[in-house]
Amino acid sequence: MDGSRILLAAHRGDRKRFPENTMPAFESALRFGVDMIETDVHMTSDGALVLIHDRALQRTTGVEGTTDQATLQELRSLDAGSWFSPEFRNTPIPTVEEFISLIKDSDMLINWELKDFPHELGDDFAFLCADRLIDTIRKHGIEQRSMINSFSDRVLAYVYGKYGSAFPIHGQGIYRCQRTKDTAGVAQEELYNWCCLYPNVKGQAPLDFPENFAYCEKHGILPCVCVPDHMDAYKRYVALGCRMFTSNDIYEADRILKELGLRSS
């Protein structure tokens, strides 16, 4: 994860073909051979770690409530697949342990995005979620394959302050396009190893703001993007210095990167 090659990451697994953040989506991404899987971590009311993007359950399960107000048993009983297709009816919300069991014996990199935010749930809850994730990562010996990601600079500063350089820190946006949920008293150029770049102006694209890529280069931050998988855009992002594409269509992203000579066949 040192930026020596351009990485292809599956955003919430193979979400183009399977319901996002479910074991079928992760299994497909692993089979396909992406470099990394990005996934989203929440903690339940009884302290278990689950993988689901939204804190609110409605979008992917059709049920009211939030991850932090439900027990693991309650969340595991929900259907996280039917919203995508009837074919995936009764697909459960996976746990972090279940996901690690899948990828542990591979060389898959993992981008763990911590989604419990201090401004919503308080420092204690958000930081405990981070600690439990890192304890689990260490228990399974996958530290060297894991990066810690969050929209909350407060969470990232906590992880960095407690664990130092044990994990690459992945931020979301820089000062000119700040989209973090909570700010922290640590300069982003000191905190971030990686940063997903966003447009400074709504409706435009990250590539419209080359100064953000230049900022990353100046401060030794590896830039990445999560954008539509189009050849012309990929060419421009590569020229600007992008080192990772977090893709919603891994098949198309892989095709483009191979055509550009940036992935082996």
Predicted stretch roles:
Residues 1-265:
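Phosphate-group recognition and catalysis centered on beta-loop-alpha active-site segments
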